[in-house]
Regions:
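Structured secondary-structure scaffolds
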Residues: 170-186
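Beta-strand-rich interaction surfaces with strong enrichment in secreted/lumenal proteins
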Residues: 41-42, 106-109, 119-124
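Active-site-adjacent structural elements in folded domains
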Residues: 115-118, 169-170
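Short Pro-Gly-centered flexible turn/kink motifs
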Residues: 3-6, 122-138
Length: 186
C-alpha cells in the first residue's frame, strides 16, 4: 500500500487568521476492553517527520508528514479523570485538543502512543490557501517523495472515468454536481 494524501484548506474569512491542520492516525481501541488483546503502537520516526505504526494484525506502516511542525502523541483511551473522576491513562485521547486549545501539557513527549496528530500551523490571509501532503505506506523505511506526478495521473484517470459516464451535453456546473454525486457513492 502507498497512499498519497493532499489536504488543502482556504481562509474564507475577511481577516488574516491562524489555521491548525491536525491530520490524525489512530488505532481503534480494542485493548482496554479485551484483556488478551495486544496494544498497537505509534511512534515518532524520520527525524520527527514521520509516524511509525505497528499493529499485531495490520502489520507495519509509516505516515510521512514532511511539512509537519510537530507530532503529538496520546493514547486512544477515554479521559477517566475528566468523565468519571477516576484515574486513567496519562495521555488520554482528548490530550491533542487540550494541547491545541489550552496549551496544556497533555501529549506524550516521548513521542509514542496509540493516537498521533501531525501539527501544521499556517497563517493565512483572506482567500489564501495552504496545502499539505502526507504519505501512508507499508514501506517502513520510506521517505517523502514528490507526489505531484501521482496526483496528476489520478486526476487524469478520474477525468477519463467521468467523461466516459457523463453526457457530453451537460454544462460544467452539472458535470461538477454529477461528479460529487458519484463520489458520494464510492
Amino acid at each position: 500500500d502507498d497512499l498519497h494524501i493532499r489536504i488543502t484548506a482556504t481562509n474564507r474569512g475577511p481577516d488574516t487568521a491562524m489555521l491548525w491542520l491536525l491530520p490524525t492516525l489512530w488505532f481503534r481501541n480494542t485493548w482496554s476492553w479485551r484483556r488478551d488483546a495486544p496494544k498497537p503502537r505509534l511512534a515518532t520516526a524520520g527525524a520527527g517527520k514521520a509516524i511509525d505504526a505497528e499493529h499485531d494484525t495490520l502489520g507495519r506502516r509509516r505516515l510521512i508528514c514532511p511539512d509537519a511542525d510537530g507530532l503529538w502523541f496520546v493514547d486512544n483511551e477515554t479521559n477517566g479523570r475528566r468523565l468519571y473522576g477516576v484515574d486513567g491513562p496519562a495521555y488520554p485521547k482528548d490530550g491533542v485538543n487540550d494541547r491545541l486549545v489550552h496549551g496544556a501539557d497533555t501529549v506524550n513527549a516521548a513521542g509514542e502512543g496509540t493516537k498521533a496528530a501531525a501539527l501544521h500551523e499556517r497563517r493565512l490571509g483572506p482567500g489564501e490557501a495552504a496545502t499539505i501532503t502526507l504519505r501512508l505506506t507499508d514501506e517502513v523505511d520510506a521517505r517523502a517523495v514528490d507526489a505531484a506526478p501521482v496526483f496528476a495521473r489520478r486526476m487524469a484517470e478520474a477525468d477519463a472515468f467521468y467523461a466516459s459516464r457523463l453526457p457530453a451535453a451537460l454544462d460544467d456546473d452539472r458535470k461538477a454536481i454529477a461528479r460529487q454525486a458519484y463520489a458520494g457513492l464510492l
